[in-house]
């Protein structure tokens, strides 16, 4: 086994300083192996594993680059010169005789975007932090979700752009896709991001432990699967364990795969049935279609993309039709069979009749469930239901001092929502200063933030705040302004004029309370919409803001103008 150098910030080589271990030494997670000198200063390089060092592959004073092998080691289950187990191990696999006991201010369980951001923020505020992760840092988002999916989508987007090169006066003949290299790039991005997170946690003096954590009734966190095990007495505990794909009973056929398996499968099938037209399903639909796969989406609901703006969904539906993606709504899958040739037959009910569809593979994208150990939660006295761990308005569970953030609390399944919730929890733990007196306001009530949402179809959708449908249900009187990208100069330059920007204004206060962009750069425009809503901007305040020309963001300004005097570059 090898211990490699992680990501070196700035891209320049580091210099090896004092080597703190010798061949034959037993090392534990968090133990300093080597001191390094980088452009960011002197940093200790710490072990993330338990094992015995068998070879030192670097010399003091030598240059080190990202990915260089620094040490070779053997794990606890072999070759350490004793009985095949590490120090303090018992005679049975997975059972530790020695237990390390630790005290910390905050114990964070889960190293995804909720957990690691919480840990970094807490450490930056001066708290002692322990982060426990059973798998890889970055969680689902970095390893099996947001990041790898968007890396593949970027390759698909470039491939699609090259096929349209003639529109821009460029000849690009004999374009070929090397899927191994496409997936290698995806894997490299994930690997570099993991190394970056590890570097940041180490630099912030966050103790990282690999293992499975369980909260005990006295707010002690027990960690197993490591050697040794750990008992961590924490002042506060943050549960950030994320979620997992839901796989119905009919999806147990070998022809079915979930999103995790799809991201590891380097072959693009010639045909694919996707069950579920939510965000994950539709992003994969556009991804596979871009690489030449025949895609058929089957959705139980009578609309796609959940609660997304209906007008934006219509833009995506038209784009899907143009790309040859078939979508069947109001359809219930009943069973999936594998044929002798290894292909799939999906049976589904629609309009009172049974239908059958054939494809090489089936991708199941019907939703995600919270990742939680129900038995352990019951033993600890922490309440939960099928949506996730129950929390109050301050994200605190039924056990005082224990919080749940991100997917596991069932509120909103977005990585940036988990990060925002984690930061809010730490602010609540520390208290906030009163601006007038300078004193501390202990345990401030957490205010629900405006969480933007992005869907990486082609074109994209970005939204924030309330939708028109929500406003109707809540009897909020609003005025709506829509500006089409056909009237935006930058959209025409990019050759992407589908879609629009929509702003929703509360009539009485004239505050912007919602917005949606469907079209080019919508993922970036979602942040612009969130800023306007979070800061209670009115149509006047937004329209007085100067937006650079030519940019797609001008569509936001035009929509704001449409709420009062009227759009400048568009008239219905």
Language-model segment annotations:
Residues 1-35, 44, 84-85:
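Acidic, low-complexity mobile loops and tails
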Residues 5, 9-18, 47-55, 64, ...:
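Generic structural motif
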Residues 85, 93-103, 120-127, 132-268, ...:
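Glycine-rich flavin
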Residues 87-88, 146, 239-294, 298, ...:
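Glycine-rich dinucleotide-binding loop and its adjacent helix/turn
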Residues 97-114, 268-278:
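Beta1/beta-strand and adjacent pyrophosphate-binding region of the FAD-binding site
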Residues 107-109, 213, 231-242, 274-275, ...:
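Short hydrophobic core segments
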Residues 109-114, 118, 123-135, 140, ...:
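Flexible, glycine-rich terminal cap/loop adjacent to redox cofactors
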Residues 254-270, 358-439, 524:
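FAD-site-proximal beta/loop scaffold in flavoenzymes
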């Amino acid at each position: 086994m090898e211990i490699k150098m992680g990501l070196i910030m700035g891209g320049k080589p580091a210099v090896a300083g004092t080597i703190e271990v010798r061949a034959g030494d037993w090392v534990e997670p968090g133990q300093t192996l080597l001191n390094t000198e980088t452009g960011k200063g002197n940093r200790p390089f710490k072990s993330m594993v338990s094992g015995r060092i068998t070879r030192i592959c670097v010399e003091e004073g030598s240059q080190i680059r990202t990915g260089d092998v620094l040490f070779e080691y053997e794990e606890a289950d072999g070759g350490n010169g004793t009985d095949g187990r590490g120090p303090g191990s018992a005679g049975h696999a997975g059972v530790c005789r020695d237990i390390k006991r630790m005290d910390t201010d905050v114990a964070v369980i889960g190293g995804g975007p909720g957990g690691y951001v919480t840990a970094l923020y807490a450490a930056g505020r001066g708290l002692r932090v322990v982060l426990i992760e059973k798998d890889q840092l970055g969680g689902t988002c970095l390893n099996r979700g947001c990041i790898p999916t968007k890396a593949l989508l970027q390759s698909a987007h470039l491939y699609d752009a090259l096929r349209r090169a003639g529109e821009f006066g460029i000849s690009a003949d004999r374009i070929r896709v090397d899927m191994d290299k496409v997936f290698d790039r995806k894997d490299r991005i994930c690997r570099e991001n993991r190394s970056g997170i590890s570097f940041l946690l180490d630099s912030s003096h966050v103790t990282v432990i690999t293992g499975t954590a369980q909260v005990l009734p006295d707010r002690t966190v027990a960690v197993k699967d490591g050697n040794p095990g750990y008992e961590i007495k924490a002042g506060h505990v943050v549960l950030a364990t994320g979620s997992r794909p839901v796989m119905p009973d009919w999806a147990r056929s070998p022809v079915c795969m979930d999103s995790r398996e799809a991201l590891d499968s380097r072959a693009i099938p010639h045909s694919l049935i996707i069950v579920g037209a939510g965000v994950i399903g539709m992003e994969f639909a556009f991804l596979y279609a871009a690489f030449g796969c025949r895609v058929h989406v089957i959705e139980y609901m009578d609309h796609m993309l959940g609660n997304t703006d209906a007008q934006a969904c219509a833009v995506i539906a038209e784009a899907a039709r143009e790309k040859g993606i078939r979508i069947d709504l109001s359809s219930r899958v009943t069973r999936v069979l594998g044929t002798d040739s290894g292909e799939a037959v999906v049976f589904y009910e629609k309009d009172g009749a049974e239908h059958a569809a054939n494809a090489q593979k089936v991708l199941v994208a019907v939703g995600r469930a919270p990742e939680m150990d129900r038995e352990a939660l019951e033993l600890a006295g922490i309440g939960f239901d099928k949506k996730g761990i129950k929390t109050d308005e301050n994200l605190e569970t039924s056990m005082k001092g224990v919080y749940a953030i991100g997917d596991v609390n069932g509120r909103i399944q977005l990585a940036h929502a988990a990060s925002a919730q984690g930061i809010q929890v730490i602010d609540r733990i520390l208290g906030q200063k009163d601006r007038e007196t300078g004193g501390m306001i202990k345990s401030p009530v957490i205010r629900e933030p405006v969480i933007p949402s992005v869907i990486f179809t082609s074109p994209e959708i970005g939204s924030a705040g309330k939708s028109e449908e929500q406003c109707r249900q809540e009897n909020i009187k609003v005025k709506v302004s829509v500006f089409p990208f056909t009237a935006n100069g930058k959209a025409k330059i990019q050759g992407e004029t589908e879609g629009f920007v929509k702003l929703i204004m509360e009539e009485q206060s004239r505050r912007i309370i919602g917005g949606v962009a469907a079209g080019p750069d919508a993922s970036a425009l979602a942040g612009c919409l969130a800023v306007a809503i979070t800061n209670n901007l009115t149509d006047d305040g937004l329209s007085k803001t100067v937006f650079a020309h030519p940019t797609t963001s001008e569509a936001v300004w035009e929509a704001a103008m449409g709420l009062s005097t009227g759009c400048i570059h568009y008239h219905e």
